[in-house]
Amino acid sequence: MSVAILGKGKKVALKRRHARIRKRISGTPERPRLVVTRSNRHMVAQVVDDTKGITLVSASTLQADFAGFEGTKTEAAKKVGELIAEKAKAAGITAVVFDRGGNKYTGRVAAVADGAREGGLAL
C-alpha cells in the first residue's frame, strides 16, 4: 500500500498514521480486525475478516439502540464497544486485532476498546 501523503494538518496526519498502521495489521478468520471509525458526532466499530474482505459484525451510534441515549460521547463509545463485543461473541469471535484507524488511542477510541474488553473480547 503506497500512499504519498505530503503536507501538514490533522487530516493528513490521520491518513499517514492509518497507512502506517495498516501496513502491519491484518485480520484473519481466527482473529479478525476490530476497526474503529470516529467522526465528530458518531462512532462506528466493525469486525472485519481481511482475507475474505467482509464485515462480520458491526455496531454504531447511528443504530436504533442509541435513539434515546443520553450521556457523553465517550459513554456512547463505550456502549458501542460493549455492543460490538456482544455481537462478536454471538458470531463466535473471541479475539480481535484492534485497528484504531489512525486516530490517537485516547478518549472515545480508547472507550470503544475498554467496552469491548469488558464485553469479553480479547484485544
Swiss-Prot record:
This is Large ribosomal subunit protein uL18. Keywords: Ribonucleoprotein, Ribosomal protein, RNA-binding, rRNA-binding. GO terms for biological process: translation. HAMAP family: Ribosomal_uL18_B. The keyword Transcription does not apply. Belongs to the universal ribosomal protein uL18 family. Part of the 50S ribosomal subunit; part of the 5S rRNA/L5/L18/L25 subcomplex. Contacts the 5S and 23S rRNAs. InterPro entries: Ribosomal_uL18_bac-type, Ribosomal_uL18_bac/euk. This is one of the proteins that bind and probably mediate the attachment of the 5S RNA into the large ribosomal subunit, where it forms part of the central protuberance. One of its GO terms (cellular component) is cytosolic large ribosomal subunit. GO terms for molecular function: 5S rRNA binding; structural constituent of ribosome.
